[in-house]
Amino acid sequence: MLKIGDTEFTSRLFTGTGKFANDKNMLAAIGASNSELVTLAVKRLDLKTGSDNILKPLQQRRVKLLPNTAGARNVKEAIFAAHLSREMLGTNWIKLEIHPDPKYLMPDPIETLAAARILCEQGYVVLPYVHADPVLCRRLEEVGCAAVMPLGSPIGSNQGLATEPFLKIIIEQSQVPVVIDAGIGAPSQATRAMELGADAVLVNTAIASSADPVAMGRCFAQAVDTGRAAFIAGLGNVSEQANSTSPLTGFLNV
């Protein structure tokens, strides 16, 4: 069982709501993935008109909603988005995203840390999306973040765990859950993330852009379970040399 803040999760696969061809595919894929936490952009919500309103069907599935501040370029905009999400959704959970560069969408570490400190002081359950920087993740933990969400590779790139050496350090050092977010493009990559000891992964593009999002959601659910089970079982040591599994010459002495 995974616990973040005051909430426990059975599934360690978190999903997103963007890039799906339609809401029907999105809801079906989320259901197939068994995900219990779904992130959605605050900028997408419009409770006054009901336009593009995906809240009701998501709430009917009883998944935990994690609003994110995607689109925020600085501390001020991120805090405004967090306040708006609390007013609209009645939740103090927030996925903190600040990326001023629209081309590469790299998270701004300085603005993210500053915003995280303020939001934690205001009583939010903060899950910051950051580069795979062990020092930054430690600082975010120190200011009160409930989890850290280091990237595997750029958002939506499907490049996998390009930052694996740094993810290993973060997982080793962290005293809060580590959720690997961004860049996971295949179920095998999600398995690898869990084998490293990550507490969960967040996957959106790889599922949403699949030819069959429902089947892909199911594949990711199985992949995450497999990776977690392998981590618990304990992977064998990696060696630079060969190690025989049976005697090579014993029969020659008979």
Swiss-Prot record:
Protein name as annotated: Thiazole synthase
Compartment annotation: Cytoplasm
GO BP, one annotated term: thiamine diphosphate biosynthetic process
Keyword Cytoplasm: yes
The organism's place on the tree of life at top rank: Bacteria
Signal peptide extent: none
Functional note: Catalyzes the rearrangement of 1-deoxy-D-xylulose 5-phosphate (DXP) to produce the thiazole phosphate moiety of thiamine. Sulfur is provided by the thiocarboxylate moiety of the carrier protein ThiS. In vitro, sulfur can be provided by H(2)S.
Predominant localisation class: cytoplasm
Residues the record lists as binding 1-deoxy-D-xylulose 5-phosphate: G156, A182, G183, N204, T205
InterPro entries noted in UniProt: Aldolase_TIM, Thiazole_synthase_ThiG, ThiG
